[in-house]
Amino acid sequence: SFGYGLFTGALGLHYGLEKIGATVVPASSGNTQKQVMLLKDFGVTALVSTPSYALYMSEVAKEMGVSNDELKLRLGLFGSEGCTPEMRMQVEKGFGLFATDNYGMSELMGPGVSGECEHRCGLHINEDHFLAEVIDAQTGDVLREGESGELVVTTLTKEGIPMLRYRTKDITRLHYEPCACGRTFARMEKTTGRTDDMLKIRGVNVFPSQIESVLISLENIGPHYQLIVRREGYMDTL
């Protein structure tokens, strides 16, 4: 359900999925009712989209009277936006699938920089193509394993516009111990925010993803929100 246009997500995944023998249904974006029917009629087993659109699709499916028993969905590969654990649980419940996260950037290659395995204990970085570091956003110093900072990526095999220590502005941590799945690639945690959208309220670092985690856990509250910071006297209020 990624848009087939200048956005790198759809075409980037399309040919990779065909390479491993999958049949791709290029639904693109929009016309949600039609997409629900495609899921049902074609017996789709894996959904690729943003997590928020998957959540919306599950709501539309229920409105159409299409139950999870009529679908064959088993896996959801989501990306292009942050996905909190609470939103992931809602998507899994809504469609009855197993959700994984994928990280990528248009500047690097689109999707496929890193992705979760079945254990979901971090996103495995494809280190045969990318060298990842985490730095202090202010000083540029490389941080140790497990320390939070800005993700910096160097492309190792990209021929068109290679990137050397590209500053993503995404905040994460790196871990190097082997995963239970057997892969030995370094793993990055889900990004908690960006260096350019972090809010500091009365000396406290506030990330929009933290606010979303609380909102998603509340009934009758959607995943869409706006944060407004006001100055009252000499103090900021959120």
What are these regions (language model features)?
Residues 17:
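Short hydrophobic alpha-helical segments of the AMP-binding
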Residues 3-14:
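Conserved coil-to-alpha-helix start sites within the AMP-binding
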Residues 8, 20-238:
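Active-site glycine/GP-rich loop and adjacent strand/helix microenvironment
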